[in-house]
């Protein structure tokens, strides 16, 4: 039996992957006359890639047939059950011809042209959306991790309802012919009350509401952004909502106070709201009365109504919050700091704004807080500022790609403060500092927007004032990210980037192709979409700066600040380095050397880390005998989630007598580099450990070896200065030492050490991971 379907038709997205369309399977099917076949006539879901298949079958020309490979457990309200006694089954030819005529009439109408045009537009928008997703996702594991984070816990199914007598009798009737009441009892029997003794029906437990996944976004000085940038940001916000990430936006008008500041904030909130509403299936909601503050104005503001705020977010609205609070005693509107507004919202979403009753049982109070935290998961704290990510003034990199707050916050804050103080000093901006500032990605913005002078001048100079303002902005963004993440679970993360970068990557391929300044063949990844899907920075922080251009889609090896100047931040984990390289630099002459039996090292946890990472048992005693007298240092990330053991190795034939000549020939060697399996590929654990090794502990270089078939070799290759296959073995040698190839003696020492190290695994197999 062929079953036609009337236009218009819509269906759930991504249910099949078959031939006619990449996402939808449409084809005609036949069913046996005595079987029930379920077909979709109309669904209230969003339309995705509507297509029709037309073919001739017998005398029924121009008839349309549809079949969908959909899940069997679709909701009943979108299913239509075609039974053998239906008119379609009794007189299929007549009905099919009528349906064909209706379809022909519909196809010739002007309304159909409008609908088809709308569908084509939707299809184009969907295509752009999926291209953005495909260009942002990196691996299948990351996609699975994203789906696992957003997957709702399944509701427990209740008892099946008791079947009514009428349904039971009807189900037992013979099928094939509609014989009315011939085989059944009279209507009076069916309609008469039935007295039975059953168990009392248990009321069905309420389904646990789905947890709201949320991104808190602060947009700085949107009044300085043109409409194309605002539209690009609005498009990205719409895509985030579509991917299951609700968006709450704080509008920061800058350093404007009083009535003018409130007016600017409201105008820009309306501007962003209008841009969001222009996106397909997107809605916005401006919430002016979101915050309250004490009359004295001390402390953070508080959220007036959690229910109003969450209900709008749960309904799929992009909520815009101007930094306006109302005083509690004598209600009046006052302008508050946008950072304070963002922190107040963070505190509310984290469930920490709850004021418990002192007389209440602590267990009850704790349960109340847990219930609040189950409602919302604040996954991302995003700062969109024209200054972009956090710049770096030390080391080879010009910006911080990833910041582990537990380890680096104080160091980076002090670094920015020192540069700011040097800018504002009486001597003026030195030539070196000025050159460093000019090499940073935000200098382009400063030169273009704020008219930085060509050469440093003595204070008070406009350039010095501008640089002070720029560095103050970076310090504020860094503090905001640190303070917000301190209130959130360790799984939450932050992003500091520019709205221009988000807007640029949100453009359609046609717009990108029309831009003459666009370079490269790949579509640029949207940092916000990429971070949502992967929970990683756009570029690995351990990647050498000279190689970042090859991985940012530009197709060249040049460093491209447009595609790399986004800072990804996490509350992170503490990093322990023994001995402390800042007080005791790691030198070959250092005595006495650290041993793995040292009380500052948790040896059982270190062994567990190694065995879990390599998936092999370690011969602990043999390993200690080999390395304890050679330890250069140990790096431990977090609670032994990752780590590295580094040694000083003497090349074969060189006496280890403690002399200067012997120490000069010693090779810095990475003996073990391990990350727990559950932390591999996420959280930046490997990057944190590797960066500490090559930037802090061994800045002059280190070497290691890996078997040729090790899947991690690609990661090693990208981060090393060179690699060398050891002939006659299954080994590859890697190093980060600059100029090693030109130093023949040192290169031979490196190779000899990598060949001579003996394994210490319990299985005694010469297969080294």
Swiss-Prot record:
GO terms for biological process: L-arginine biosynthetic process; ornithine biosynthetic process. Residues 159-172 have a biased composition (Polar residues). Pathway: Amino-acid biosynthesis; L-arginine biosynthesis; N(2)-acetyl-L-ornithine from L-glutamate: step 1/4. The keyword Lipid biosynthesis does not apply. One of its GO terms (cellular component) is mitochondrial matrix. It catalyses: L-glutamate + acetyl-CoA = N-acetyl-L-glutamate + CoA + H(+). Keywords: Acyltransferase, Amino-acid biosynthesis, Mitochondrion, Transferase, Transit peptide. Its main location: mitochondrion. InterPro entries: AceGlu_kinase-like_sf, GlcNAc_Synth_fun, Vertebrate-like_GNAT_dom. It holds the Pfam family NAT. Its EC number is 2.3.1.1. Residues 590-759 form the N-acetyltransferase domain. Residues 150-172 are annotated as: Disordered. It is found in: Mitochondrion. One of its GO terms (molecular function) is L-glutamate N-acetyltransferase activity. It comes from the Eukaryota. N-acetylglutamate synthase involved in arginine biosynthesis. Belongs to the acetyltransferase family. This is Amino-acid acetyltransferase, mitochondrial. It comes from Penicillium rubens (strain ATCC 28089 / DSM 1075 / NRRL 1951 / Wisconsin 54-1255) (Penicillium chrysogenum).
